[in-house]
Amino acid sequence: MVSSNTDLTYSSAIEGGIVVSKADAVINWIRTNSMWPMPMGLACCAIELMQVGNGRFDIARFGAEVMRFSPRQSDCMIVAGSVTYKMAPQIRRIYDQMMSPKWVIAMGACASSGGMYRSYAHMQGVDRILPVDVYISGCPPRPEGILDALMKLQAKIRTERAGQNLFKATV
């Protein structure tokens, strides 16, 4: 009995069913639409951060509804509130525990520039210890501002090269 190999031959009927894309575009689409933010609620901005999860603002539209409180399960840190020099090493350590790629949003005037606190104990912006991707102004910022910052971060992620940080040499 002779078997035919017709199953392995090319068929022109499947041409319309295949989607061809660059791997970067696919990976960035996944990263954009499934962000896992970790809130660092250090002061009163954390109360406004809670508001984006309710039905009126609905952060789930942007794929970021699941807040993770473990740095190993998150890829976006939202620093909400004033950063003191005493808290800075812990924030940096938590940031270092996050898997790559990772992004940071500085939420509010205190996290962005120190806010109204100009003292020996308060750091003048979290960007002195972390690379900040998006800043949100306001004291405290409105939930619409948080959603706008999330959309700006998603636009930034879409333009990144997804494969450049996959294989880093460890020193």
Curated annotation (Swiss-Prot):
Binds 1 [4Fe-4S] cluster. GO terms for molecular function: 4 iron, 4 sulfur cluster binding; iron ion binding; NADH dehydrogenase (ubiquinone) activity; NADH:ubiquinone reductase (non-electrogenic) activity; quinone binding. Coiled coil: none annotated. The keyword Nucleus does not apply. It is found in: Cell inner membrane. It is an enzyme of class 7 (translocase). Gene3D superfamilies: 3.40.50.12280. InterPro entries: NADH_UbQ_OxRdtase-like_20kDa (IPR006137), NADH_UQ_OxRdtase_20Kd_su (IPR006138). It is a peripheral membrane protein. Its cofactor is [4Fe-4S] cluster. Pfam families: Oxidored_q6. GO terms for cellular component: plasma membrane; respiratory chain complex I. [4Fe-4S] cluster binds at residues 44-45, 110, 139. It comes from the Bacteria. One of its GO terms (biological process) is aerobic respiration. NDH-1 shuttles electrons from NADH, via FMN and iron-sulfur (Fe-S) centers, to quinones in the respiratory chain. The immediate electron acceptor for the enzyme in this species is believed to be ubiquinone. Couples the redox reaction to proton translocation (for every two electrons transferred, four hydrogen ions are translocated across the cytoplasmic membrane), and thus conserves the redox energy in a proton gradient. Belongs to the complex I 20 kDa subunit family. PANTHER family: NADH DEHYDROGENASE, NADH DEHYDROGENASE [UBIQUINONE] IRON-SULFUR PROTEIN 7, MITOCHONDRIAL. This is NADH-quinone oxidoreductase subunit B 1.
